[in-house]
Amino acid sequence: MRLIYVIAILLVSTCQAGFFSSLVSRFTGGGNSSPSSSSSSSSFSNSRKPSLSDEKARSYLQTFGYVPPSNSLQSRNGMAGDIQSAEQVFKSAIRKFQEFAGIAKTGFLDAATKAKMALSRCGVTDAPLALTSGSSQFKWSKTRLTYSIESWSSDLSKDDVRRAISEAYGLWSKVTPLEFSEVPAGSTSDIKIRFGVRNHNDPWPFDGEGGVLAHATMPESGMFHFDDDENWTYKDARKIHNNEATDLLAVAIHEGGHTLGLEHSRDENAIMAPFYQKTTDSSGNYVYPNLKSDDISAIQAIYGAGSGRSSSGSDFGGSSGGGSRTTARPTTTTRSWFGRFFGDDDDDVRSRTTTRRTTLWPTTQSPFSGDDWGSGSGSSGRGGSSSGSSGGGCPSHIDAYTPSSSFSYAFSGSQVYTISGTKVTKVQSIHDLFPSAPTPVNAALWNPISGSMLLFSSNRVYSYYFSNIRQIFQMDSGFPKTLPSDLGFSVSGALRWINGHQILMSSGDEFAVYDEFWNQVTLKNRISSYFPNLPRGVKGVESPAGSVITAFTSNQVFEYNSRTKSIGRQSGFSSYIAC
């Protein structure tokens, strides 16, 4: 069933090419109608395909998920009647790609955008894979996996191919409990690796030299294919530096990540970024394609951390220098649903943000229990410019709470409180700091990767970025947006979990993992199933350190241990910030 799902999400419709082509000229403009921007990284260069045509750029956006198959950009009667709506979708698709690729978000198919599209890349869609309620992350249900190489490269020896695959899986093995071993072709293996060209007996034909280099499917289907029309090499720095060949090892690490359940990363330095990264420096020296922190956080969020032991060579086929671990491991306890998705079992799983605050609990504690948690006491009279404030500059309640890169922000009624450490440093109108923001704010969320501050109110989301010149937050273009209909509840709290997942919470027992880039829900479930013993009414959390988070309800603060699922120290909000 999962294989069918992956196939469905990767396949796109091109039957409306004629209508779509009529839009292309509106977004190209011959170079004068749109701003220009430069490519973000020379390490992604590929001299064989300098740019894409307008028609291929259109197809690219469909192929890699920026225009969903359900949105055909054609009116109901089959005529190109709703041109304005189609233009909006197309421009949004271009901007999504530009943001994902790290280039200027012009909304036009400018030269920089088409040049980025021309880079060699993975064939897997950039759109996130949605998880249905009650399902687990795309992952293997066991830790010992086998792979077989069913066909071979026309450029490399079998030993070099074996070494590359063994090293690739060895890197993933070093940071997870997973173990990999090669078995002979034709065996019953978990992952089947092939080299093929053009139509090669799967739903996704290759495109010849350049463009798509390889593709793979999510667990537990185990499909892993390289395009044999590429010129492959194994760590040959001269060929790689001169753009004569593509490093098989780098591509194998990336595709191997897909076979383990990883999607594409928006971090352009990560192995799981969709674009091929040359493995040489400016002097032509080979640079080993190691996993980056983003890759490690993502894979450990699914499987947990490994033992840290060095990997050993494969026992099959005589590979030397490989990375697949074949040594025996102690039996481990099956992880909970919570651990499978949120990676709670290890203290060394860290947020990708820097923890700014060392929790400073006040000497005088105000412990609460039972029905007092998240009850919203003291929340009457919200909405006026002065409501929600008590003596000493402290709010009597909070509607939303979030950390950011420099400060934390507590929202109460029509006011926002800037907090440094455990001190309120400024109180001002929400509209002064966030022009055109809703009041009250029901939830707030800071995304350290994009630098966006998300505000939620009713069924809408507002995205802001901080202007260093104006010293206020300014709304991103394209916002506010209506939250996806499948969210199914009113947002009353939001938090960024230890491994980077962005979580929206209801006032009851529902939560959803949310991606604002695609405005999409990727997981829904019950809070009590994933966060046992977490009090109701959580508004936000401080940047977590290890497995312990500091969480805020409307008028309370408490510690929650994500590993033991237990409540620690507790305090009233006004006591916590020493007002």
Swiss-Prot record:
Pfam hit, one: Peptidase_M10
Family named by the database record: Belongs to the peptidase M10A family.
Comp. bias regions, Low complexity: 33-50, 325-341
Organism, scientific name: Caenorhabditis elegans
GO cellular component: extracellular matrix; extracellular space
One GO MF term: zinc ion binding
InterPro entries in the cross-refs: Hemopexin-like_dom (IPR000585), Hemopexin-like_dom_sf (IPR036375), Hemopexin-like_repeat (IPR018487), M10A_MMP (IPR033739), MetalloPept_cat_dom_sf (IPR024079), Pept_M10_metallopeptidase (IPR001818), Pept_M10A (IPR021190), Peptidase_Metallo (IPR006026)
Glycosylation positions in this chain: 231
Cleaved signal peptide residues: 1-17
Activity regulation info: Inhibited by human TIMP1 and TIMP2 and the broad MMP inhibitors BB94 (Batimastat) and CT543.
Name under which the protein is recorded: Matrix metalloproteinase-C
Swiss-Prot/TrEMBL domain comment: The conserved cysteine present in the cysteine-switch motif binds the catalytic zinc ion, thus inhibiting the enzyme. The dissociation of the cysteine from the zinc ion upon the activation-peptide release activates the enzyme.
UniProt-annotated catalytic positions: 255
PANTHER family per the UniProt record, alphabetical: MATRIX METALLOPROTEINASE (PTHR10201), MATRIX METALLOPROTEINASE-C (PTHR10201:SF329)
Feature: compositional bias, Gly residues: 315-324, 373-394
